[in-house]
Regions:
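The C-terminal output helix
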Residues: 120-154
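Acidic, metal-coordinating helix/loop segments flanking the phosphotransfer/catalytic sites
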Residues: 35-55, 63
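A short, hydrophobic beta-strand element within the central beta-sheet of small alpha/beta folds
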Residues: 79-86, 90-103
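Conserved acidic segment of CheY-like receiver
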Residues: 2-26
Length: 221
């Protein structure tokens, strides 16, 4: 299965660095896509969806240089990471920066922040696991989480249709449904109060919605 990695930077030279870096690593089925940041964060997130990206690598200070773009960017890489993960829980995102302290503080996660030198194919430090391999590992982990949730959800739906589900099963079904919806786009998530399984019509709606989410996810995998 291919890995589509979207790289976002306002400077063409770093876009080229990333393309060269991925090419040099020569890992099978990795496709690098480079984009300039959109002026608004919502437009940028739409690009992520349109490109069917499996992971996003973004510069931290997206509005710092105006050599290749002439418009203003009203967000930084940490803002983009937070917005993506609000919509897709656990989605693989990484920030590259020359300003480690600021990026770590704003992202609130030291594990997603890397020095920009990691994508320079001529200066990358020798590491047991390369930056690109770490990205792929996170994509695999995210996909496995979704796959496992899909399988468990289908099992619970079948169990509930046979009237064999316990209260704990019903609660877990709702939890899994939330996870799958958020993995596609949390803006489409059903409010928790609607998901109270107090009658058969609500259960039927939940099952229908779960099937739609699984189908939607399969079309973008």
């Amino acid at each position: 299965m291919a890995y589509r990695i979207l790289f976002i930077d306002e400077q063409k030279k770093y876009q080229n660095n990333f393309l060269d870096y991925v090419e040099q690593k020569n890992i099978e089925d990795v496709e690098a896509i480079v984009k300039y940041p959109e002026s608004s964060i919502d437009d940028m997130i739409n690009v992520v969806y349109e490109e069917l990206a499996d992971a996003v690598v973004t510069d931290f200070r997206l509005n710092e240089y105006k050599t290749d773009i002439k418009y203003n960017i009203d967000y930084d890489g940490a803002d983009l990471l937070h917005s993506l993960r609000e919509r897709r829980k656990g989605f693989p995102c990484f920030i590259l920066t020359s300003y480690d302290g600021d990026a770590v503080e704003e992202s609130q996660d030291v594990n997603v922040v890397y020095d920009k030198s990691v994508i320079n194919p001529y200066t990358e430090k020798s590491e047991r696991v390369s930056f690109l391999e770490k990205i792929i590992k996170q994509i695999d982990h995210y996909r496995k989480t979704i796959d496992n949730a899909e399988k468990e959800l289908c099992d619970l739906i079948e169990k509930r249709s046979k009237e064999e589900a316990s209260l704990e099963d019903e609660e877990r079904l709702i939890e899994l449904d939330n996870l799958l919806e958020s993995s596609v786009d949390r803006r489409g998530e059903i409010p928790a109060e609607f998901k109270k399984l107090s009658n058969q019509s609500r259960l039927s709606e939940l099952i229908k919605k779960a099937d739609e989410i699984i189908s939607k996810y399969e079309t973008i995998s």
